[in-house]
């Protein structure tokens, strides 16, 4: 019974599991990783600072009932092994393995059976004893809508009840970067002053975006006055389709994000 359920759910990730169920199954995972600038990452002061930041973030997430847990070495190795051996996962051959504490984690993430080839537009993963060859392709946004909120990212997994959905494993990364409060405030004030000058010129009557830009920077300055601030946001989409389905999956990813008013384009030479 367990094997039948597993087969049923695995099939639903790429195709409708039954004619009467036109849906796609999803096993979604969410990870949060924080990068803290430091000159000496191995210093005790830097580690204490990182532990303090982690404690604050865990407490904040608990307030919103996310109940996060801190990764250990085993979870780190298994998660990255799943990403770096996609051909094993797609062929149904990937499995958990015990972590060797005597070896560095980075030496245990890529299987000995995995062959990796770097191409201009992607990375090829293959194994000698498995038929499906996987090509990892990266896409990045080159245009965002005028107004965008994080809740719209709920559509990023595709329409599970429609025809527009990923039929291969995918990884969506959201980058959030925040500068120091004082630097951000000074930058917002300078940009706001410049935008206000441009919006007061005669040419602003013919270019409505100048008025909108002034309004946006005015709101940014007000956010700093209320103790808030600004963040820089970007996304990257990685898809892991079989080589024969790359074109279809790239167009699917572009279509999904286009419904969110985000224009994606395929990356080249990302490995450099």
Which residue stretches match the model-derived regions?
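Extended, folded cores of ATP/NTP-driven motor/assembly subunits in large transport
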Residues: 1-272
